[in-house]
């Protein structure tokens, strides 16, 4: 073969390779990035925050539930009684606090003053009697025991007088700040116990936290539950999230707010629409559940994609193909 012919063939082959590479690159650009993921499985165990006997359950397995819907109730009676006791405790503490703030009435002060006069008279009598007994003791008219009895009576009367004087002084000056503060603290404690009793009564009714589908019903009416015991397991149906993974090469395309198309095997020609809501800040090895064997050993970043037009056909755990491209649009 002549040399010019060989050179010509080489040029043709090289041109074909370049053209093929360009076509492949261009097709990749046109088609955009494709990722694979699954609809997130989101379940929650529902329980009463308080314990008690299950009075009634309003739903069964497979039922659709709405946020705020009553799902079950415990026997309310113990919590209603506790609430009544807490209300009574607040009333007592409030009355005591009000008394502390108001101080003492004029009638109480007058009674305390009269008690001081009576105690003073008793002390004066006891002191005079003791003085006389001392004179008799010196003249050896009475025994030492008689003198000691007189001294004891005098000391007791003196203590009674001091107590009455202190009480009158307190009545006239009002309650001490420490006593008022203690009464206020007792009132606040009673109010906190009332709030707790109200919350316990409220929590004896189980309410759905969000829309979903009931997967399991773990107990039946009549069951006595501890607080936190699982009653239902619920699959959360809204919002619908798709979990996918992107490698570092394509991370710049998967920015929060980016719109994507979501394809399922059941409707390959009618995609759902989604928007990237979260990109993990840390890399991880691709989970085995991802349908991309070539990426399973790579370090990737987890994406959460919010499906904006989800319907009941998009079920949790379903494999999804995530398509990036101009047709998906950008934020």
From Swiss-Prot:
GO terms for cellular component: periplasmic space. It comes from the Bacteria. It is found in: Periplasm. Residues 1-15 form the signal peptide. InterPro entries: CusB_D23 (IPR032317), UPF0194_membrane_YbhG (IPR022936), UPF0194_transport (IPR050465). Residues 107-208 form a coiled coil. Pfam families: HlyD_D23. Keywords: Coiled coil, Periplasm, Signal. Belongs to the UPF0194 family. This is UPF0194 membrane protein YbhG. It comes from Escherichia coli O6:K15:H31 (strain 536 / UPEC).
């Amino acid at each position: 073969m002549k040399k010019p012919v060989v050179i010509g063939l080489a040029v043709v082959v090289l041109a074909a390779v370049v053209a093929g590479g360009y076509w492949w690159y261009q097709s990749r650009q046109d088609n955009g990035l494709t990722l694979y993921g699954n609809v997130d499985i989101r379940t929650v165990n529902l329980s009463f925050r308080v314990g008690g006997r299950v009075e009634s359950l309003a739903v069964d397995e497979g039922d659709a539930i709405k946020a705020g819907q009553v799902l079950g109730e415990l026997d309310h009676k113990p919590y209603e009684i506790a609430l009544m006791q807490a209300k009574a405790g607040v009333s007592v503490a409030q009355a005591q606090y009000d008394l502390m703030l108001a101080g003492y009435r004029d009638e109480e002060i007058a009674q305390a003053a009269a008690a001081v006069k009576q105690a003073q008279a008793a002390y004066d009598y006891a002191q005079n009697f003791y003085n006389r007994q001392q004179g008799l003791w010196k003249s050896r008219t009475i025994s030492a025991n008689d003198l000691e009895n007189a001294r004891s009576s005098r000391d007791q009367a003196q203590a009674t007088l001091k107590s009455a004087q202190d009480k009158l002084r307190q009545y006239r000056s009002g309650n001490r700040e420490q006593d008022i503060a203690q009464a206020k603290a007792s009132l606040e404690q009673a109010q906190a116990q009332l709030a707790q009793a109200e919350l316990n009564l409220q929590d004896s009714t189980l309410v759905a936290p969000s829309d979903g589908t009931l997967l399991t019903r773990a107990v039946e009416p009549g069951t006595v539950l501890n607080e936190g015991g699982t009653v239902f397991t619920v699959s959360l149906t809204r919002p619908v999230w798709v979990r996918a993974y992107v490698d570092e090469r394509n991370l710049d395309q998967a920015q929060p707010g980016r719109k994507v198309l979501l394809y399922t095997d059941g409707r390959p020609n009618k995609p759902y629409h989604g928007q990237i809501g979260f990109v993990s800040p840390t890399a991880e090895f691709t989970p085995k559940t991802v349908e991309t064997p070539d990426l399973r050993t790579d370090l990737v970043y987890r994406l959460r994609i919010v499906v904006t037009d989800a319907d009941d056909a998009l079920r949790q755990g379903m494999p999804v193909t995530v398509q990036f491209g101009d047709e998906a649009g950008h934020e």
